[in-house]
Amino acid sequence: DGFVTDADLTATVENTSIATGGRDAESVDQAKRYAPLYFRTQDRLVTLQDFKAFANSFASNYGSTGKATATVRRAFSSANIIDLFVLERASNSQLRRATQEYKRQLLAATESKKMLTDEVVVVDGLVRTLDVVVTITLDEKFRRSEAQLIQSARRSILNYMNIDNTDFSEPFVPQDLIRILLMDETNIRYAEVTNVEKPIKVGFNEIIQLNNLAIRVDYV
């Protein structure tokens, strides 16, 4: 599944999908996003934001963490049913369906912190994979530096799509990706996501994850 190239067109393709794996220590981006929220829970789970912050900071006894979001279902009784939609981290760039053990441990961890009238249900979140094709336009003088510029652009795109920088229900907006890419890579004259024209929206329990990344190069 590559791309045809000619003398003035170059493409690189990267499949970012993997099957399984662990994870490193909590990233700086993840800490910035969730640590202040978790601190504000004061070790009690009352609001949906409390549940979300707790689940996103939770680590199983085998060191696995994930991404989560929370919604509430109003029951006919006085109890609220809190749905925790979770995905387990397979690596620093990939999420997967959470294992039963991970979900069991997460549910058990909420028991002593939730309100007595709340019922917590741990549910599978959904991953929506996305292939991205980006064409970058460079000045002719950078032809000899093409490989380095492609690699630098790739790092910028992967960082933008990193799971620590995305969340449930967040759309993919190609214009936002290009804006960040051009801010990061000042030697790129012009860039375009050529296979996605409009923002891609997802449901509240879905998260967009990069699958294949291809970078093509034009010269002027």
Predicted features, each with a name:
Residues 42-173:
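Carbohydrate-recognition loop of C-type lectin domains
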